[in-house]
Amino acid sequence: MNESALNPNYLFHPFVKRFPGDPEHVRNISDIQQLEKYPISERFPCQTVTDALFIAAKKYQHARAMSYLPNGRADDVLQSWSYLEFLEQCIGAANLFHSLGIESDHSVAFLLPNMPEMVFGLWGAQAVAISTPINPFLAVNHICGIVTETKTTILVTLSPDTNPSLFEKALAVKHNTTHTMTLVTIGTPCEDAIDWHTELKKQPFNRYLFNRQLTGMETSAYFHTGGTTGTPKIARHTHRGAMINACQMLIVGPTETELDTKSKVSLCALPLFHVNAIVVSSLTSLLNGSELLLAGQQGFRNKALMSDFWRIVERFKVNFFAGVPTVYAALLEQPVEQHNIDSLFYCGCGSSPMPQVLIKEFTQRTGADICEGYGMTETTACASTHYYYGDRKVGSVGMRVPYQHIRAVHLDDNGQIIKECDCDEVGVLLIQGPNVIPEYKQAFANEQAWPEPGWLNTGDLGKFDADGYLWLTGRQKDLIIRGGHNIDPLIIENTLVSHSDVVMAAAVGKPDAYAGELPVAYVTLTSGATLSADELKQYCKDYISEPAASPVEIYITAELPMTPIGKIFKLPLKHDVIVRFVRELIQALDDTLDFSIDIIDDVSTGNIVSINFAATREKMEAVASQLQQELDKLHFQWKCTFTPVLAEQTVLES
């Protein structure tokens, strides 16, 4: 442990160090540049999460590190661990894995819901080997691919009496992989696996049974990415990358002095197989001495948690939680005003763009600030965010975190850089920094991922304004993001073309005010086929393992747009589904209106949906406010031109 834990020159000491000339509060890019005058090795000295847990235990000792609501209800009997007890559980888990013979270059995979054992296990595994959290909803073949690629020799899951389907899935994974893998279960002991709690009791909790000298650049974890419903890419995380990213967020957030005046309780209800929950919610909480409140096994998927959420905030004085746009929209359907939630002052949002009207309504009704950020598995977690003491530009995703850089560029068809984008010019986003992963585990995933050494091609589109704020405008890649749930269109397309009557298929995202996007598909059929769209939708439900990926609409068409070299050209389909959506929206408001819809491609702002109406003034005034209210919920630029009869042309736009 580092004695600098007692040094007053450290902010969140000893994780973030202060130097002469540092700004008191980080407000803008100039402040970031001032911080960057000192080397990152001096600014963020701690090298590994394993070291950080020891340092935090020494500093915070008997303060609560983590609490658990087993059912995600406000009246649950709380289970709690102090910082010292938290460290002991992580040490015990590491010793358990060591006793099962794991090697340092092997991994422990976790097929679990959100529960304390997963947190202890993840960081215990990183002390002795590598941790690999896996989405329990993935299909068996995808999980088999992950555990094979990551050299998983221990798989932790729930016992058959606790969750029969999850245990059967884990058993199927074990039987369908060629290498030896030990199954460890949590719950009632069973014959087919080693029992977690029985073996844990045999381990010492005050020392490691192994001698491993960790360095910051060693692999700490493998996180799968690229969509929960397609072939997952595996990102290699390092110990140093995790520590740096957590510290990057701490230094642009509220100061330790300000946090000490709050209740310091961070609620976590996002899935622990995702970097947001592990790094943004959990690791930063432990580094700043907060209490991590784990809100039930299913997190935000649990309807009981959603209905009880504001009671939980009130009872436990929660001051921070992170969510996705669909979560925030659902929480506003609950009665907020009848609860005292003054403790809540800071919320995080990522995964997909959040409608501005939703941000404003949430802040107005709760008094809490939503901090929109941008990041991905490949940046460990966070790449840009709104600084706590900086100005808010609602609709942007803030500014870059320190010691990391983001560029907007134009790329050619081979993924090579053509030019740097000007201010307010849309381009593909590239990211470089110490929090960016060194590589994907699979060779195929690294192809065209790095246009320049160290610079990751995110596949996202965005622009920077004159103040350095980043504005996302779309995605170069074709992932469909449904309520923060990444859907690879290829899995939909492959399923559809597996039908004997389907020739070609293309899946795209349809705008949705609640989920952001919903998957839809366009298909062409064989000559003479009489297959209906409803039959194809049922076919997808039968063969796509993740329900969220099943298309909500299927459009049967005579042909699909193609590029000159014979590839399906999706841009016209993306435009078509937007036009269909807006047309349905307008007709639902007034089916007698005369209008036209066009998609305008603008290099500086991205696509603009242009709607032109020819109507009487009475009809125009009747529909204008309703239409604006509905369009403002969506995350695309729009422009409505109303041409009233016998009146001047008027314009309404976002």
UniProtKB/Swiss-Prot annotation:
Q: Any phenotype upon disruption?
A: The deletion mutant can produce both marinolic acid and acyl pyrrothines, but not thiomarinol.
Alphabetical GO biological process terms: antibiotic biosynthetic process
> What is the protein's given name?
Marinolic acid--CoA ligase
Native organism: Pseudoalteromonas sp. (strain SANK 73390)
Recorded hits in InterPro entries, A to Z, give: AMP-bd_C (IPR025110), AMP-bd_C_sf (IPR045851), AMP-binding_CS (IPR020845), AMP-dep_synth/lig_dom (IPR000873), ANL_N_sf (IPR042099), ATP-dep_AMP-bd_enzyme (IPR050237)
In terms of PANTHER family, this protein maps to: LONG-CHAIN-FATTY-ACID--COA LIGASE (PTHR43767), NONRIBOSOMAL PEPTIDE SYNTHASE PES1 (EUROFUNG)-RELATED (PTHR43767:SF1)
UniProt function note:
Acyl-CoA ligase that catalyzes the CoA acylation of pseudomonate C, leading to the formation of pseudomonoyl-CoA C (PAC-CoA). Also shows high activity with pseudomonoyl-CoA A as substrate. In addition, can activate acetic, octanoic, 2,4-dodecadienoic and 2,4-decadienoic acids, although with much lower activity. In vivo, is probably involved in the biosynthesis of thiomarinol, a naturally occurring double-headed antibiotic.
The chemistry this enzyme catalyses reads: ATP + a marinolic acid + CoA = AMP + diphosphate + a marinoloyl-CoA; ATP + a pseudomonic acid + CoA = AMP + diphosphate + a pseudomonoyl-CoA; marinolate C + ATP + CoA = marinoloyl-CoA C + AMP + diphosphate; pseudomonate C + ATP + CoA = pseudomonoyl-CoA C + AMP + diphosphate
UniProt xrefs under Pfam families: AMP-binding, AMP-binding_C
Which SUPFAM superfamilies does this one have?
Acetyl-CoA synthetase-like
To which pathway does this protein belong? Antibiotic biosynthesis
The family this protein is said to belong to: Belongs to the ATP-dependent AMP-binding enzyme family.
Q: What is its EC number?
A: 6.2.1.60
Q: Which Gene Ontology molecular-function terms are recorded?
A: acid-thiol ligase activity; ATP binding
Q: What class of enzyme is it?
A: ligase
UniProt keyword terms in alphabetical order: Antibiotic biosynthesis, ATP-binding, Ligase, Nucleotide-binding, Plasmid
